[in-house]
Amino acid sequence: MSPRKTYILKLYVAGNTPNSMRALKTLRNILETEFLGVYALKVIDVLKQPQLAEEDKILATPTLAKILPPPVRRIIGDLSDRERVLIGLDLLYEELSDDSNAQVLDDFSE
């Protein structure tokens, strides 16, 4: 099992809409159960800080951006699908590759 990585995440929302609040609640649940406190989450309201959304080229909300560890990943839209979020954060793949029964093909050359 590889050592736990620290995740740095940004969640872009548009105000206190039901969709924004649902995204935040779902994400916090995932983070508390899967990341065990080894993360930093910054919530950015694009209505209050539009310059940050513009700098990061955010076109839709909610958008979850994983900044660290690389590579940078973005999940745009509904965050209620737990598996989709975990795959988007590369967490599900890492768990599968850490499993001794999992086979990962690294080289396709003959």
Curated annotation (Swiss-Prot):
Give a yes or no for keyword Iron in this entry.
no
Matching entries from InterPro entries are given as:
Circ_KaiB, KaiB-like, KaiB_domain, Thioredoxin-like_sf
Q: Name one GO biological process term.
A: circadian rhythm
Question: What S-S linkages are listed for this chain?
Answer: none
Output the superkingdom of the source species. Bacteria
Pfam short name (any one): KaiB
Q: Which UniProt keywords apply?
A: Biological rhythms
> Partners and quaternary state?
The KaiABC complex composition changes during the circadian cycle to control KaiC phosphorylation. Complexes KaiC(6), KaiA(2-4):KaiC(6), KaiB(6):KaiC(6) and KaiC(6):KaiB(6):KaiA(12) are among the most important forms, many form cooperatively. Undergoes a major conformational rearrangment; in the free state forms homotetramers as a dimer of dimers. When bound to the CI domain of KaiC switches to a monomeric thioredoxin-fold (KaiB(fs)). KaiB(fs) binds CikA, leading it to dephosphorylate phospho-RpaA.
The record's domain comment reads:
Has 2 forms, fold switches to a thioredoxin-like fold (KaiB(fs)) when bound to KaiC.
The role this protein plays is: Key component of the KaiABC oscillator complex, which constitutes the main circadian regulator in cyanobacteria. Complex composition changes during the circadian cycle to control KaiC phosphorylation. KaiA stimulates KaiC autophosphorylation, while KaiB sequesters KaiA, leading to KaiC autodephosphorylation. Phospho-Ser-431 KaiC accumulation triggers binding of KaiB to form the KaiB(6):KaiC(6) complex, leading to changes in output regulators CikA and SasA. KaiB switches to a thioredoxin-like fold (KaiB(fs)) when bound to KaiC.
Tell me its family.
Answer: Belongs to the KaiB family.
What is the designated name of this protein? Answer: Circadian clock oscillator protein KaiB
Q: Which organism is it from?
A: Synechococcus sp. (strain RCC307)
- Upper taxonomic classification of the species? Bacteria, Bacillati, Cyanobacteriota, Cyanophyceae, Synechococcales
The gene that this protein is the product of is kaiB
